[in-house]
C-alpha cells in the first residue's frame, strides 16, 4: 500500500462524470478519518454555531443537555462565554440509562428543578427550554417530540405554565441523512413562531446565527421601503423573536435553512426566496435582480459590484501569479469558492473537501479552467499521509487548509459573522492581501 494521500484532479473527476464520483471523495462510503484539520466541524455541538449554540439563539431560552458525561464535555468552553452563563444545564445519563432509556422519565423533573434553581437565585425565568440529546437516543429510537410534549404538559397549571419545551438533536451520525442536525435545529427554532397578521414592510433574513453586518443586502431592502428587517440574532427578547411571524417574506441565506423556510411557508404563509452565498460578482448580481423581481423592489447594485471587482483587481495586480489552496472549514462552499477564484484569474492548487454530488457542477466548470487542481477529502483515511511540505501554494483559505500547509500564509475565513454578497468578496480579497503583505514583511 502506498503511503500517500489519495487525490483526484478536477479533470479526472470530469472524465468520470457525476454518477461516478470516486468513493474516496464521498462521505459515508468508507472508513472515516477524523482529521485534526476538521475537528472543529466534525461534532455538531463543537466549535462555532453547532447545535447547542444554535438552539440557544432563541432569546430567553435555556438548554438541558441529556447525555453521557463524555458527550457534554465539549460544552464547557461554550458555557464559559458570558452570554451563555446560567443557560446550560445537564442531566447525565448513567450506564443503565443507556440500556433502558429510563432517563427519559427524569426529564420533566429535571426541567422543573432547573427552573426552580433559576427562580431561587433571582435569575430570569426562560420562555423556552431546549432539550439537547445525543446519538444515544438516536440508537434507542427515542421519540423526542413526545418526550418534549409530555415535559411541557407537566408544567401546565403550575408557576411555570406556558414555557415551551423543544428538542435539539445533536446526532452526529445523521449528518449525512435527510435532516442533518443543523437543518433540524433551524426547523425547531422557527417552529416556535405562531400565526400573526402580516406586515407588508417586514422581512426576515434566516439561515445564520450571527447578524449580517456591513452587507449591501440590508441597505437595498431599506432603500426599497422595508422598515423591519429581522434576524434571530438581533432579536433581544422572545416577544421580538415572535414578531418574525409577521414577515411578508423570508430571505434564506443558507441552504440548511431551506426546510425551515418551507415549514414557515406552509404553516405561517410566509413565502421565501433563497440567496446563495457565492463569490462570483456576476452571480451575486443575478441573485439581486431575481430578488428585485420577486419582491417588486428596485435594486441598483452597480456601485457595490464595481467595488468588489476593484478589490479583486487590486489583489490580482499585486500578486498576479497567486496560487491558493482552499479548505472546507470556511464561510464558503469550497468548490464554488475555488471556481470563483479561478475565474478571477488566480490559480487554485488544492481543495480539501468532501465532494457531494450537488457540487459536481462546480468541479465540472473548474476542470475546464484548471484541470490540474487536486481534490482531497478531509475524511479519507489516507490523509494521514498528506505531506505538509508538498504544496507550492502562496496562501491558503480555511482552518483545515492551515493544518495541511502550516508554513504558508492563511486566511481562516470562519468567523461567526458570515460574509455575504459583494461585501464577502471585498472582505476576502482584503484579508488575502493583508495576509500576503504580512508574510512579505
What are these regions (language model features)?
Residues 1-441:
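An N-terminal assembly and electron-transfer interface module characteristic of large anaerobic redox
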